[in-house]
Curated annotation (Swiss-Prot):
Membrane topology qualifier: Single-pass membrane protein
Cell compartment(s), UniProt: Membrane
Taxonomy, superkingdom: Eukaryota
Gene3D superfamilies: Cytochrome P450
Designated name of the protein: Cytochrome P450 monooxygenase 124
Protein task: Cytochrome P450 monooxygenase that is able to use trans-stilbene as a substrate for oxidation.
A GO term from the CC aspect: membrane
Organism: Postia placenta (strain ATCC 44394 / Madison 698-R)
Entry keyword annotation includes Secreted: no
Record-linked InterPro entries: Cyt_P450 (IPR001128), Cyt_P450_CS (IPR017972), Cyt_P450_E_grp-I (IPR002401), Cyt_P450_sf (IPR036396), Cytochrome_P450_monoxygenase (IPR050121)
Pathways involved: Secondary metabolite biosynthesis
Binding, heme: 453
GO molecular function: heme binding; iron ion binding; monooxygenase activity; oxidoreductase activity, acting on paired donors, with incorporation or reduction of molecular oxygen
Length: 517
């Protein structure tokens, strides 16, 4: 027994020594560049909040925003942890970020971190170099002006049905959590403009042969509970003793069947109907491709449309939620937006797609929300060759950052968006800052460079359409709750904007009231 104990302690000591040496090697690789040191890095999801020197915390990037850079006197800092053992440069310098995002060969995406997004098949997000170009050649044409018009028209139809039918006869509607409104709106839009499947606010009980649930329900369950597919093994999903997990697995398999059927129906149709939803456009572009080496397989087609689903649904739903919260908190800004909308779209008529360019304050409102609440807090990259990054300290003096090949890089979106070097009074909600000239290189909600989000215009069109229609007809207020009576404005703001991050950043709970104008 004593010998086993000695062996166990010896192995433990050897493991600890190896980890210590690996940690020192990681620190030496970056020449002990100033920054943060932890036992557990941000990759350790067990720890949400930061514990100094112990755990970086999964939410630390959002919680600290630009403060870590101020504390270490530069807009590029290091972060080194033991579990997993790695050193990363965190970057909130706009020029350094521009250099990284515009040079794909020198600063590629670390593909191993994206493998979890290959559920249905390889796609544009999880590929690099020539393979990425192949996916982009087929995918990019789907995001056309005709698709943008479809997004606008269908979004207006969806919120009009909500206002005229679902909320008919009601002068006041209470949402206990605003995401309960914005998530279905975004879901319906991606359903029709993404998949060509029009959905309704009315419950659908029709289940096609060979399926377990309607398309709408399968899409809703998969998009809302994708974390299960990310975190849980396939064998557990299939036989989990938890009904909610099994239901997700059924929905996932059903959605896959729906997509396969849609592909086959489009391929075998004698006369192809001219349609501009993303899936139909993607299939058409693939069919028209004459180079057999460029064509996407069925699994790659599904992989790409799945990425559109997640990116489009999550990002827009949560951005709209944050925008409604900010409008409820800042009534003066809501009034400015209302007056602006009425000046562009008078007489209670429906807003037209051609008027989107005139809705400048509505667009500014959206951009300011995205600045303050970027969907993704971190964009990972890596150095493919030895190089030097350049930044400056808080006094404006130049700082050179040695960067060896293989070094991990992380574009720190909240650090950039709250950097006072680029944004005056960064914690203030000021949509007007986007009406004139503004620092475009310091704004990264959709990434930047050649790999920036293809669906940016899709998301912006949907969001502006929703805001234009709803704000013109409904005033948004905070729901008064007795347990929060007497709270200050800052306390109320902190409560309503309390956020967590899963696939994207989202508000925890924000009860709002919509009052008919």
């Amino acid at each position: 027994m004593h010998s086993l104990l000695v062996l166990f302690v010896s192995l433990l000591a050897l493991g600890a020594l190896k980890k210590h040496l690996d940690f020192r090697a990681a620190v030496d690789k970056i020449h002990n560049y100033p920054g943060l040191r932890f036992i557990f890095g941000v990759q350790s999801f067990i720890f949400g909040k930061r514990i100094p020197y112990f755990a970086a915390g999964g939410l630390s990037l959002w919680d600290t925003k630009h403060q870590d850079f101020v504390d270490h006197d530069a807009d590029i800092i290091s972060s080194v942890n033991i579990f997993p053992t790695c050193a990363t440069y965190m970057i909130a310098d706009a020029q350094a970020i521009k250099e990284i995002t515009t040079n794909r060969a020198r600063f590629p995406k670390p593909l191993q971190q994206y493998k979890i997004l290959t559920f249905f098949g390889s796609n544009i997000v999880v590929t690099e170099a020539d393979e990425w170009k192949r996916h982009r050649k087929i995918s990019a044409p789907s995001f056309s002006e005709r698709n943008n018009r479809l997004v606008w028209d269908e979004t207006i139809n969806i919120v009009k049905e909500l206002s005229d039918d679902v909320w008919r006869g009601k002068n006041e509607v209470t949402m206990d959590n605003i995401v309960d409104l914005t998530v279905p709106i975004a879901l319906f839009v991606i359903g029709v403009a993404g998949f060509g499947r029009r959905m309704s606010w009315v419950e659908d009980f029709t289940v096609p042969a060979g399926h377990s649930m309607p398309f709408k329900d399968a899409l809703h369950l998969v998009s809302n509970h994708l974390w299960m597919k990310v975190l849980l093994p396939a064998w557990f999903l299939r036989s989990a003793p938890i009904p909610r997990v099994r239901k997700f697995h059924t929905a996932y398999e059903d959605l896959e069947k729906y997509m396969i059927e849609m592909i086959q129906a489009r391929k075998t149709a004698e006369k192809k109907e001219e349609r501009y939803d993303l899936f139909s456009s993607l299939l058409d572009a693939n069919e028209e491709e004459t180079d057999g080496n460029t064509k996407l397989s069925d699994s790659e087609l599904m992989g790409n449309i799945f990425i559109y689903l997640i990116a489009g649904h999550e990002t827009t739903a949560h951005t709209l939620a944050f925008t409604f919260i900010l409008l409820a908190l800042y009534q003066d800004e809501q009034e400015k937006l209302y007056q602006h909308i009425k000046s562009v779209v008078p007489d209670d008529r429906l807003p037209a797609y051609e008027e989107m360019g005139k809705l400048t304050y509505c667009y500014a409102m959206l951009l300011e929300t995205l600045r303050m609440f970027p969907p993704v807090n971190l964009i990972p990259k890596q150095a493919a060759e030895d190089t030097t990054l350049h930044t400056s300290n808080m006094a404006g003096e130049p700082v050179a950052v040695p960067c060896l090949a293989g070094t991990a890089l992380a574009i720190h979106t909240p650090g950039l968006h709250y950097n006072p070097r680029y944004w005056e009074d960064p914690f203030a909600f000021k949509p007007a800052r986007f009406l004139g000239d503004w620092p475009r290189d310091a704004f990264l909600p959709f990434s930047a460079g050649p790999r920036s989000c293809l669906g940016r215009r899709f998301s912006e069109t949907e969001a502006v359409a929703v805001l234009t229609y709803i704000v013109a007809r409904w005033r948004i207020d905070v729901k008064e709750e007795p347990q929060f009576a007497g709270e200050t404005f800052e306390q109320r703001k902190a409560r309503l904007l309390d956020s967590k991050s899963a696939i994207t950043l989202y508000p925890v709970r924000a009860p709002l009231v919509f009052k008919r104008r």
